[in-house]
Every structure is written in structure tokens, then in C-alpha cells.
Amino acid sequence: MAKLERLNREEFARRRRQLMRIMGKGTIAIVPAAPVRHRNSDVEYPYRQDSDFQYLTGFGEPESVAVLIPGREPAEYVLFVRDRDPLRETWDGRRAGPEGAVAQFGADDAFPISDIDEILPGLLENREKVYYAMGSHPEFDQRVVAWLQGLRTQARNGRHAPLEMVALDHVLHDMRLYKSRAELQLMRTAGQIAADAHVRAMRHCRPGGHEYGIVAELLHEFRRHNADTSYQPIVGGGANSCILHYRENDMPLVDGDLLLVDAGCEYSFYASDITRTYPVNGTFTPAQREVYDIVLAAQLAAIAQVRPGNHWNAPHDAAVEVITRGLLGLGLLKGKLPQLIKDGAYRRFFMHRTGHWLGMDVHDVGDYKVGDEWRVLEPGMVMTVEPGIYIPAGSKGVPKRYANIGIRIEDDVVVTRTGCEVLTDGVPKTADEIEALMAAAAAA
């Protein structure tokens, strides 16, 4: 992989301009950076910038606040950042400082974060509306409330606080739902890295290994391309494949079991999310293949519904119909297809939705409904498509040959002008393709 791809300054500037057009004059938006979080004692978690802050600024440091003031001269975009500090930079890394915030990150003006209590109330003064995501940063919420209350006490002096607080996250998250060309290119890269990692994991899967060994293969591929995990990988063999959010990843890989691997990477702040399920020994049993082919057919039917003009729930409806019909064919459900779908009988074995939005967050922002109606799919929206069937041992009325079969197949799909594009098609998906890849790896 070449040098880490990044969005250019103009991409961030375009987003800020778009947001300020939506806000209108006489308004102000306040967006804080993510706080540093402690793992234990004096050990910190690796710092990851707040997605909304990153989306608007591209500025990766903590203890920062972005302020947007449409129409303000001479500075519409103001950053509050940490001052340069040679001693702290020796310990913790370089800082941009106020000068760097302007020169490198496109701020119109920048101030030390230590001065925010003196400066920001003046920026709030006499604005009609303040756009802020109340509740997203509880500690910072208290400071915003204090600034507003302080202004209200000075109303007799002609200093007026904004009359209305508008939920910034609602506006900003609708913007984030539509990916630009530059964003989609990063998501293609994230998808390709994750696809390569899944192929590597398949090739290293053997009876006698362990789930954590598969995790290691995934992480190896992520890190060698300067990517990280977009969420904790789920690597569950046998009975663990039937646990949707299995976390331990520490059990042996057993001959005859299936292995469900749900793992994606984050590359330059954009996530991928892939799931594949395959036999530990490289060969599906007849029962495993029966169930696998139903899930694959459901996923392909769902992907076929990802196109402009269809509503968000269309892929799920398609997957539900295929899975319910398949469960009827296996004898795991009994009754008439329409009634079983209406009653949700399939939820015994397929209990989750078929997908979610994908972007800077793996479960990305954006409403699924507009009012009471499912949202209509439009070009630039990115979603996962991930139906599954899970049959834990001891399920009442289920033949033993299906016990502990947990299968999910997941890809990342972008809505295009004419249909859709699968961003993660670099991983084998049919049972025959999977067996061929694993056989070749075993023979190598």
C-alpha cells in the first residue's frame, strides 16, 4: 500500500461551506473535539478524533473546538487549539498550535484553547441560533450552558444570548450520509484492505488453531496497510458463530465446525465491515452448505434491491423472503410463507436487520426513516448488506445436523446512479469459491 491517502483541505472547506449555507446568517455552530480517554491508571486509549469534528476540520488533536459563524467578517471559521509546548511535544508528539491551525488546516483564525472562556461568549453574543449537539459531550455541554447563561445575565447591557438551540447532529449527520467521490475512494481502499485480510484469514484457518490466531492474521493485514480495526473483530467457531456479538475470540478451531469472521478496518477515518463464514477444515458438510446457500441467496437478493428510488427497507424485505422460504424448505419453519413473514417467524433464526449505514463510523449516522416512511435510497449512500441464519444447539424441533450452524455474509455497498457497487467483492463468497481457496492454501 502506498502512502496513507487523505482528504485534501478543499474537501473539508466544502463541507464547512455547505453546513454554513444550511445554517444561514445570524447563527453559530460549536463543535468540540473528542476527549482523551483513559484505559486504566495513566494509560490512555489510542486517540481517535470525534467523527463530526474530523468531518468538518481534518484536525486530529484533542482539546480543540471548531466554531463556524456564517457571514462573519473576517473569520467565519475559528479553531481553538492547544498552544505549542516544546516540553509536552517531546513527551506526547507535535502540536499544530494556533499558527498551524491557520496555515495547515485552513482556519480563518485560531486561538489557544486556554482562552476559550474569554473569547467564545463574545462570538455567541447576539446570534439568533446556536447549532450544537447537546448530549454528545456531557462535560463540554456544561461549558456551553454556562456561556449562554452568562450572556443572559448581561441582557440589560445589550449582550444577548442566542434565542434557539438547534440540534447540529441532525443537520450534520444528514450531510455525512451522502459520500463524495473522495470519500468513496477511501472507502474502496478500506474495503480492499479488509477483503485482503479476510482472504488471508481463510488461508490460515486450520483445525487445531485458535480464534485469536485468525484475529492475528486480520490485524497483520490491517496494520501493514496503515489501517486499524473499525470495531473489535468477531471470530466465532462452532457454537460461538451463533452469538451475534461474540467477543472472547479465544477458543480452539474444531474440525467440522464453521467459523464466522466479522471484521473490518478503518482507513483514513473511513470504515469497512465484512463478514464471511467458512468451514474450519475447508469443506462444508451437506447441512452447512444447505444453510449457507440460503443465506447467500438472501444476500444477493438484498443487494439487488440496493438502487436509487428503492426505500431503505427493500433489501431487508428481500432477504426476509428468501430466508423464510429457505427455512420452510429445511423444515425449520412450518406454515404459509406470507403468514410466516407477517408474523416474523423467521426471527427465531434471523433476529437482526439486514444492514446499517457505513462511513466514518461503522454504524454510521443518518436517519433510516423520514417522518413515518422509510428513507429513499440515493446515490452516495453506503450501507452494509448482512443477512444471517443462526441455529444454536438445543433449538426445539431442529435436527441435530443443523446444530451450531451460524452463518452471516456481509458486504459494503454504495448506491450509484444506476444501481449499486459492492466495495468488498474481493473476498470469495460462494461455497465452491471458499472451498477452492482453502484447498489451495492447504496444498501450498
State where each predicted segment sits.
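Active-site neighborhoods and metal-handling regions in enzymes and metal-associated proteins
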Residues: M1-A444
